């Protein structure tokens, strides 16, 4: 069984992330969205909420599972029986970091391959950082995130 692990902070999950998950769900038997705790990034949403939002966004995909984790990614992949890491590349500027990450992961988990997918053109410019900034300033984010995520961001910035 081919199990792909799609790791990220997903703070928040965007339509770009959703696009990659949809496509991965057609390519692999099982997709695990691995939501990283990432405390050093100081996420806007707590881990539990990011997991819940990702589950809501992907609930229509029967072969997709969402799990939060705070361990080393290579160890988590082994625990989950994943044989592929999925990473998205929006632009050439993403490649250098992703290349380094793939090589490090290969050293730590030699049995897990890294697979890079580019997003659909309509999502190639979306990033969680930009979505958070637009939401914080009261801008319309409905084109970039699922309605449940837009509601969560609106609620978060009301405070």
Curated annotation (Swiss-Prot):
Pathway the protein takes part in: Cofactor biosynthesis; coenzyme A biosynthesis; CoA from (R)-pantothenate: step 4/5
Keyword NAD tagged: no
Residues noted as binding substrate in the record, renumbered to the chain: 9, 41, 73, 87
EC number of the protein: 2.7.7.3
Cofactor(s) of this protein: Mg(2+)
Binding site for ATP: 9-10, 17, 88-90, 98, 123-129
Catalytic reaction(s) noted: (R)-4'-phosphopantetheine + ATP + H(+) = 3'-dephospho-CoA + diphosphate
Record's keyword annotation contains Amino-acid biosynthesis: no
Annotated family: Belongs to the bacterial CoaD family.
Name of the protein this chain belongs to: Phosphopantetheine adenylyltransferase
């Amino acid at each position: 069984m081919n199990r792909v692990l799609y790791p990220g902070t997903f703070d928040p999950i965007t339509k770009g992330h959703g696009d990659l998950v949809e496509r991965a769900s057609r390519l692999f038997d099982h997709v695990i969205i691995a939501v990283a705790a990432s405390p050093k990034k100081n996420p806007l949403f707590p881990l539990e909420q990011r997991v819940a939002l990702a589950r809501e966004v992907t609930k229509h995909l029967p072969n997709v599972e969402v799990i939060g984790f705070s361990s080393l990614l290579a160890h988590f992949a082994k625990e989950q029986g994943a044989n592929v890491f999925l990473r998205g590349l929006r632009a050439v500027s993403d490649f250098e970091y992703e290349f380094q990450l793939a090589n490090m992961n290969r050293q730590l988990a030699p049995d897990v391959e890294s697979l890079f997918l580019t997003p659909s053109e309509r999502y190639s410019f979306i990033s969680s950082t930009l979505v958070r900034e637009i939401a914080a300033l009261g801008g319309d984010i409905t084109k970039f995130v699922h309605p449940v995520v837009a509601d969560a961001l609106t609620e978060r910035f009301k405070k």
